[in-house]
């Protein structure tokens, strides 16, 4: 199959995931934005369950990995295996590691290491608008 057709199919597949998102969700998930600190619906959520990608419902984080980091966004010290891809991010004049959904490539937030906030020494800093919480039944 010619390269152009493969790229076109991928674009169509990806855009379908994002069709039902609100404008604000698209700004975060598709345009790689960041929601205002302390504004996210899941920041203080302590219920048991799972967090999935808002765009494609790919399981991302178990609630057991969520912790209070006082950074203004939901934080997790572990991810579900193969749920997330990491990308170098040089925006805003600094080097960071962006995290995206491994299924739809939607922007989730950034990952930080070496802060000493948990025993795993890692913080997935996630936009609430990028995720959906599924309560444990």
Language-model regions, residue ranges each:
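Bacterial Sec-dependent N-terminal signal peptides
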Residues: 1-9
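A short Gly-Trp-Pro
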Residues: 8-137
